[in-house]
């Protein structure tokens, strides 16, 4: 489903990703965790070329792109197709403020997949029901809570029928009482067998849904394993240090 080989990302002299190798299978739920500045979000953004990698190979489904390749029409087309297969949900909701919830979701199927307004509306209605917002179809973002806006953002990404969903700390901008409603939607996607890659600090959620946990630090994958292995019996000292700090913060 996803294969990353030798992925390097530099911002000037700063090497943020230092040769990442990662394979994610179809229907697998992978949680990426680590301290701030470890390269988690950059890795996620490289997976669908929101960030152009410096070196390495990225494959999503049948679409394979080498980093640093010649920017020609064929490469642009492959990247465009790869992006269609990867839904991306950001920390901030990035909804169009002048469009209603249903209009936000309709935008992608019409603009990218060439659907008719009627077809796009049917897709949007189904997805709003899926995320528990059927009664908010005609509300504008300003009329929705943060949790509701993020659920619309998830529905908008699902409207493009992606192979994989990428979540970049989807609850970090939410008030604590709104976090669970978003996590429940993500959990339902996992239960349906969708391939998910999630950057999150929600450790209990990771324990609950992750097939595999990847711990990153300083641009490297330090350790990976099942959620049980990582949370109950981490092998690397750096992983143990990180988890103990997170647990201390949660306890307080």
PLM regions and their residue ranges:
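ABC ATPase NBD coupling module
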Residues: 65-87, 117, 233-234
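Short coil-to-helix segment of the ABC ATPase nucleotide-binding domain corresponding to the Q-loop/switch region
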Residues: 99-107
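Conserved ABC ATPase signature
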Residues: 140-144, 148
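A short, proline-enriched helix->beta-strand linker immediately N-terminal to the Walker B motif
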Residues: 159-163
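Catalytic Walker B motif of ABC-type/P-loop ATPase nucleotide-binding domains
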Residues: 165-168
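ABC ATPase "signature
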Residues: 224-225
């Amino acid at each position: 489903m996803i294969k990353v080989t030798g992925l390097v990302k530099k911002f000037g002299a700063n090497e943020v990703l230092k040769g990442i190798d990662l394979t994610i299978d179809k229907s697998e739920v992978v949680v990426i965790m680590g301290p701030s500045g470890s390269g988690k979000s950059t890795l996620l953004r490289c997976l669908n070329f929101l960030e152009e990698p410096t070196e390495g190979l990225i494959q999503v489904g049948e679409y394979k792109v080498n980093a640093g390749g010649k920017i020609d029409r064929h490469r642009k087309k492959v990247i465009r197709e790869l992006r269609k297969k990867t839904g991306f949900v950001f920390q901030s909701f990035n909804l169009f403020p002048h469009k209603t919830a249903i209009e936000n979701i309709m935008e992608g199927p019409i603009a990218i997949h060439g659907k008719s307004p009627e077809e796009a509306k049917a897709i949007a209605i189904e997805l709003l029901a899926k995320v528990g917002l059927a009664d908010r179809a005609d509300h504008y973002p300003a009329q929705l809570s943060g949790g509701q806006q993020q659920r619309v953002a998830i529905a908008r990404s699902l409207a493009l029928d992606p192979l994989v969903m990428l979540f970049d700390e989807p609850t970090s901008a939410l008030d604590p009482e709104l976090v669970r409603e978003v996590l429940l939607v993500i959990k339902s996607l996992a239960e349906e067998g969708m391939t998910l890659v999630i950057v999150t600090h929600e450790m209990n959620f990771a324990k609950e849904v992750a097939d595999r946990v990847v711990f990153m630090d300083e641009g490297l994958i330090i350790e990976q394993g099942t959620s049980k292995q990582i949370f109950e019996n981490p092998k690397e000292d750096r992983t143990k240090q990180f988890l103990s700090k997170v647990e201390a913060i949660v306890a307080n």
